[in-house]
Amino acid sequence: MPFVMAIDQGTTSSRAILFRGDISIAASAQQEFPQHFPASGWVEHEPEDIWNSTLSTCRAAMEKAGARASDIAGIGITNQRETVVVWDRVSGQAIHRAIVWQDRRTADVCTRLKADGYEPMITDKTGLIVDPYFSGTKVAWLLDNVPGARGRAERGELMFGTIDCYLLWRLSGGTVHATDATNASRTLLFNIHTGEWDDELLKLLRVPRSMLPEVKDSSAHFGDSAYELFGGSIAIRGIAGDQQAATIGQACFTPGMIKSTYGTGCFALLNTGAKPVRSNNKLLTTIAYQLDGKRSYALEGSIFVAGSAVQWLRDGLGIIKHASETGPLADKSDSMQSVYLVPAFVGLGAPYWNPRVRGALFGMTRNTGPAELAHATLESVCYQTYDLWAAMRADWPDADAAPPVLRVDGGMTASDWTMQRLADLLDAPVDRPVIQETTALGAAYLAGLSAGVYPEPQKFADNWRLDRRFKPAMSAATRERKLAGWGRAVKGLLASDEGE
C-alpha cells in the first residue's frame, strides 16, 4: 500500500505526516523554528529555517515509517497563507526574511489605498478587503525597502511566492515556480473570477508580472522532488493553503458546510459552491479549492489570535506551564465576574478589520486572578467565532435550509471546555472529527487524488468520522447576556481607536 506524504508548514512549526491508503497515519514529525519581531507589529521568519525544518521533518517521518521515496505516491503541501518570500531567480537566495501573514507593517499603505478609493475595485476582483494581512502590499514593501530590489524585479531577476511556492521551488531543485489557486487567491493580485493574475492590480501595487508563479489546480502534478533530497524523486501532486486544506480534510464539499480551524489564529470557511458569494458583513470571498479547472468558492472569516492567546498566558504571563492546564484553571473562575479579553494583539480581523487597535481586558475587579484570565482567554476564541458564525449565516442565502453544524479542528479543539462553550454560544452543535490532523489530511488527499490513491471527493467524504458532538447546554438568557457583554467590550475597544 503506497504512502502519501503531507507537508504542513505552519506559523510556528513545520510538520510532515505519512498517510496510508486508508487515510490512517503511519508516521509524523514536527519541528519548531524561531519567530522574529524586529519592530512593533512586524513578524518575520528566516526562509532557510522554514526550508530546513520542512526537509528534516520529511526525512524523519520517512525514517519512522521505514518508507523509501519509491514507497510514496505523492507529496501534498499545505502552508501558512499570505506569508511571502522574494528570492533570486538564479541563486535561490531570499532577499529578505519572509514577511508573515500576521505582520502589520503595511497598514499605512492600506489606509492610503482605501482613501484613494481603490478598495471596491480590489474587493470586486479578489474577494478580499484591503488589509496588511494579504500578500500584495508585503511584496510591494519588499521591492520598495530592500536596496536594489525593485530594479532587480523589473529586470526579471527576482521571484515571488507564498510559502507553498517557495517550498515547491526548493523541493524541485529550483526547476518549478508554481502555486495553486487557493494560495493565489490570498495575494491581492489574483482575480478569483477569471482565475488569472490581474494586470490592473499588478500595476496598482507595482509588482512585475515576471515575478509571479504559474497557477495550477489544487490537485495536479506540480513537479518532482530533486533526487538527492530523499534518495529518489517523489511527485509533488497537491497544494492548498492551510485553511482550504482543512476544509478539504473536513470533507466540506457540500455548499453550506462550515468548518473552523483553531491554531495560532482561527479561520472559519463556508463552502458556497461554484458561485462566489459577496459578503455584506466584511467576510472574505475566496477560492476553497480548484479541481479539474473548476473553482469552488467559500466565505471566510479570519481571526488573528486564538491559540496564540493561550501561548500568551503561558509565555507572557506565566500563569500556566502547558496549554492543557487552561481549561481546568478556567473552571475555577469566579462565576460572579464578567471578564472579557479582546485579544487584538495584532489588530482585529473579521468582521471588524481594524489593524490599529490592540488587546484589552474589560470587567476586571480587585479579585480578578489567573482563573478569570484563563476563562476570559478561552471564551475570547468562542466569542470571535460567534462573530464569524453570525456573519456567515447572514450572508449565506440558504442558511435556513439545513440545521447549522460547525466542524472544528486544530490544537484548541482538544479542550473539551472550549468546545462546549463554543456550542453554548453558537447555540449549535460542534462536531470534532476522529482525525484531528485535518489540514495535513487535506493536503494528502489532494496529492492522493492526483496519484489515484484516494477516491473522488464524495466517496472521500463518506470516510469522515465523528469523535464527539458538543451540544448546546446554556440557557438563552445566559447566552444573550454573555454575547451582549462581548459586544460592549469590542465596541469599547474600537471606540478607543476612534478617540486617538
Swiss-Prot record:
Pfam families: FGGY_C, FGGY_N. Glycerol binds at R81, E82, Y133, D242, Q243. The keyword Isomerase does not apply. Its EC number is 2.7.1.30. It catalyses: glycerol + ATP = sn-glycerol 3-phosphate + ADP + H(+). InterPro entries: ATPase_NBD, Carb_kinase_FGGY, Carb_kinase_FGGY_CS, FGGY_C, FGGY_N, Glycerol_kin. Keywords: ATP-binding, Glycerol metabolism, Kinase, Nucleotide-binding, Transferase. It comes from the Bacteria. Key enzyme in the regulation of glycerol uptake and metabolism. Catalyzes the phosphorylation of glycerol to yield sn-glycerol 3-phosphate. This is Glycerol kinase.
